[in-house]
Amino acid sequence: MINIALVATGGAIGSVFRYLVGVWSMRLAGPNFPWGTLAVNIVGSFLIGLLVELVARRLNASIEMRLFLVTGVLGGFTTFSSFSLDAVSLFERGALGLSAFYILASLVVSIAAVFAGLALGRNLF
């Protein structure tokens, strides 16, 4: 139960940070481009790489610390960082084809799913 609380707390913190970046970018750059989303995806991807290396591998931090920081905070900040880590992990294991498939399938199918969800939502009423 403590693990769920750690992930939930971290997720709440990450979500608030994502919201604040969105507000800040909207005020700074306006609504014509999703700068906030781009920023959290890039920063989140950098941070997940840094934290996995430092917290998990070098500092040998507890599973609770990893759950809070990586799954919780960064998961709440951006799920794109998890996607990026999974793709790089496959690549580093030598599964180049599987990594490429994962990247393409994730992007193409996710975008198609958004279109499908929009279409369904628009046709329900």
Curated annotation (Swiss-Prot):
Q: How is its activity regulated?
A: Na(+) is not transported, but it plays an essential structural role and its presence is essential for fluoride channel function.
Entry's Gene Ontology cellular component terms: plasma membrane
Binding site residues for Na(+): 75, 78
Q: Where in the cell is it found?
A: Cell inner membrane
User: Known Pfam families for this protein?
Assistant: CRCB
A single GO molecular function term of this UniProt record: fluoride channel activity
Q: Does the keyword tRNA processing apply?
A: no
The answer to whether UniProt assigns keyword DNA-binding to this entry is: no
Transmembrane parts of this sequence: 4-24, 35-55, 68-88, 100-120
Q: Which NCBIfam families match?
A: crcB, PRK14195.1
- Known PANTHER family for this protein? FLUORIDE EXPORT PROTEIN 1-RELATED, FLUORIDE-SPECIFIC ION CHANNEL FLUC
Write out the similarity annotation: Belongs to the fluoride channel Fluc/FEX (TC 1.A.43) family.
Query: Any idea what this protein is called?
Result: Fluoride-specific ion channel FluC
Name of encoding gene: fluC
